[in-house]
Amino acid sequence: MKIYKRMESFKQEAALLVPLYKGDRIPDEITELLGYDVTNDICLNYETINETLTMGKAEVKKIIFAGLGEKEKLTRSKLRKFMGKLARKEKGKICVWLDSLDEDKIFDIVYGMYYSMYSYLPKEDGILSYASDKDVEGDIRKAMSCAAAINHARHLGNTPPNHMHPEDVANDAKRMAENLGLRYEILTNKELKEMGAGALLGVNQGSAHEARLITLWYQGDGDAPYTALVGKGITFDSGGYNLKSAAGMHWMKLDMCGGANVLGAMQWLATKKVKANVMAVVAATENMIGPDAYTCDSVLTSLSGKTIEITNTDAEGRLILCDAITYAQQKGAKRIIDVATLTGAVIGALGTTYTGVFTNSDVFYQELKHAAEKTEEKIWQLPVDEDFHSQIRLSDVADMVNSVSGGKGGASLAAAFLEEFIEDGIEWIHLDIAGSADTDNGEGYRTKGATGAMVETMAALFEK
């Protein structure tokens, strides 16, 4: 989607969009252009659309007066969704009148339009122009770069699995790091075996493609401690020998959305030059069946040295995450947020719009909650305590099991498993985005597929 500065550079078929609050008068320039005042003829309730043809009086064919409703009731998400739907309706060929709007609203309008116009398959570029006497180009560029970061995460998740193997995730992360000046490290099976990352390697055994452990560093705050964003990057999940059903296997390319969204958050932070020190650790592998694939009853030794009895090969995400979490701590992270499409149980509990949150720190959770309130992403805290830890530790042959049969409290049990690998003094949050990571029906605001869940909230956590 391209952006131009003035409507003079616009095509004849484009529309001029004028967003107005309830009670606003039509800008004098628009009245002069039309030759009459239409203020009393239009309704400006939220999501009302009033169109009028210019009859050759302007370089655009029509003017759209978009009702924003009452100013105090307009939320960021409502504005983004409405503007995004309008952008898709007009196929991006739209000029936006921005003179009457403040910086935050300009950001949300451009962000919503840019987000909504994303498509995995290449299409004709939309052409977003703007009309304003104010200096808003910086605000627009900022919104574009942030939307580009979340769309990058969405694109990684939406890419077909035969084009997005672990090495492809690593190559994408490398390109991004080099473009943004980030330090990076990519480990392959040889290094992972030498360091003892047995949980990640165990999951990888059935795949024809080697695993990758990808680490990026963004240093924007001198010698301050690092926070790690740890992402699950299962590029395709067959379930292993606990094989998924046909319906359950469909869309399992999206099982890497945790890793993709972590990379998107890093792009956002680096582009905006946020004052923070953040590392991203993404464990990438397929979970497949094959002659060497791991099986139930196997015992894996994790990077931490703790042993894990495999009771379900389809509970693989927590296995690759536990090694990534340990590695982040070895690299000096003092705070950890792990992100994963981890359990179907969280969908049963919270549906498809909320992200489940688990933590060992009320202080850290309140910071995340404040960030989520700012971005208007929906989160909900769920329990993780000794009731769940005691079940995870019930193994006769290892320190713990990777899954507990019975299907009760599955999201909390998965979180408890991960917390077993959090060292003393480390603040930790687990985000289960199994429900919020994708949408299976293309809404007016966004296309079918990956949503980029929690990218913006993770970034907002570091923005002061």
Model feature map: region roles:
Residues 1-233:
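Short amphipathic alpha-helical segment within the helicase RecA-like ATPase core
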